[in-house]
Amino acid sequence: MEPFRIHKGTAAVLMNDNIDTDQIIPKQYLKRIERTGFGKFLFDEWRYDNERHENPNFPLNAPDRKGASILITGDNFGCGSSREHAPWALADYGFRVIIAGGFADIFYMNCMKNGMLPIVMDKDMRENLTKTDAREQIEVDLENEVITTSTHRFHFTIEKMWKEKLLNGLDEISITMQYEQEIREYERKVAVY
């Protein structure tokens, strides 16, 4: 996993509350276990009409929001089923940071495990952040827990364990590999039957 320290990017705004994982990526696209290729299906039923033409009224389809890597959204983001495909779709689309009023617990952990930073921020702060010009680069500094725009600085908090994992680019496998020598020693000592 790539370490996450400072991210600079533009933001897309989708301030709906209770966006569930089926709205993030509908179930008909979950037939694969690779982590890539899901971005084109992100918010599929909102981004496209029945003939697969882009919906011009959907915020992510606005020309000045294309290429955004920060998503500012409502409360309870990622609720519903715990499909890991939802963070995969967000990451494959290009999002590195999701800022919401809150997240479903499993979705929150799945974001972290996939190298994305989910930030919990109150509504007033998010609304101030949405006023940032669509072309402005927003800086997200994980180490100092600060989001900076040209006019504001917003502080956020993150649990120390998750912060360290993201800063160091550690997933479960890389953490296990830190104990490779101890595992080998244990396996040598234990009898094989």
Curated annotation (Swiss-Prot):
Disulfide bonds: none annotated. Keywords: Amino-acid biosynthesis, Branched-chain amino acid biosynthesis, Leucine biosynthesis, Lyase. It catalyses: (2R,3S)-3-isopropylmalate = (2S)-2-isopropylmalate. SUPFAM superfamilies: LeuD/IlvD-like (SSF52016). It comes from the Bacteria. Signal peptide: none annotated. One of its GO terms (biological process) is L-leucine biosynthetic process. Pfam families: Aconitase_C. One of its GO terms (cellular component) is 3-isopropylmalate dehydratase complex. Its EC number is 4.2.1.33. Pathway: Amino-acid biosynthesis; L-leucine biosynthesis; L-leucine from 3-methyl-2-oxobutanoate: step 2/4. GO terms for molecular function: 3-isopropylmalate dehydratase activity. The keyword Lyase applies. InterPro entries: 3-IsopropMal_deHydase_ssu, Aconitase/3IPM_dehydase_swvl, AconitaseA/IPMdHydase_ssu_swvl, IPMI_Swivel, LeuD. It is an enzyme of class 4 (lyase). Gene3D superfamilies: Aconitase, domain 4 (3.20.19.10). Catalyzes the isomerization between 2-isopropylmalate and 3-isopropylmalate, via the formation of 2-isopropylmaleate. NCBIfam families: leuD (TIGR00171), PRK01641.1 (NF002458). Heterodimer of LeuC and LeuD. This is 3-isopropylmalate dehydratase small subunit.
